[in-house]
Amino acid sequence: MIGERPRGIRAVLTSGALLLVALLWLGPYAWMTLTSLKTLPEIVAAPAYPLPQSVQLGAYREVLKAVPVLRYLANTIVMAVAIAALQIALALPAGYALAKLHFAGKRAAFTLVLACLLIPAQVTFVPIFTMLGAAGLVNTFGALILPFAVSAFGTFLVRQALLNVPDELIEAARMDGASELRIIYGLLAPMLRPTLASFFLFSFIFHYNDYFWPLVMTTDDRVRTLPLAIALLREQGTGVRWHVVMAGNVILSLPVLALFAAAQRQILRAVTARAI
């Protein structure tokens, strides 16, 4: 009993510290949401009050009127999902080759993958833009998706996960007549579901929030993305209407929150599997 009391106190302190960190992370999002429900005079008033005097949804109506939000949102989701799906589809065979196959230059190939992680995207911007322009892909979804179809990080992640898979399992599948592609997508992919779900979420959020590349490659509303719409909200009028900007950011964040809520179980499985 004496030894259980310090352990219980430690658990309470740990939970309290984690709760404090969670509140610090949620604080900015809560402030953004509350600001979107205020009027502009309430926002600029001094001293500022965190809660609105009365809930106002006018900022959300202004967002929907000012920019084609639904079209931009659909474009953003299509782009982010397509990129994440392509990256997973290509990272699986690449990671499998680096983890389970034996060929000359395997170590050099893995070193090259690691080196690609160190290359800033800005370095490759000009040559990729030139190639896409020459191919006539500007203002198309191809220009937004194809440059990111291959992920060095995804390849590294899959390779590391496959190192924990017994070689005997793969040999047994080969003896049963399974092809390499059947082994990769039919046997190994379901086993790596937590890892792939974590990577899908990471890739989706990264490209969903991407501002620079869609800004450069698109000028047509048919393919523009939602982060560009948020920037347009800042530029309208003589001053920044912060309640409208915050409302746009709340709309922008909703699909990501929904995706995280749907995938959190797989993410926890991936984290616990790494811990074990």
Regions of interest found by a model, annotated:
Residues R7-I276:
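A structural signal for multi-pass alpha-helical bundles of membrane permease subunits
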Residues M1-G3:
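N-terminal hydrophobic targeting signals that begin at the initiator methionine
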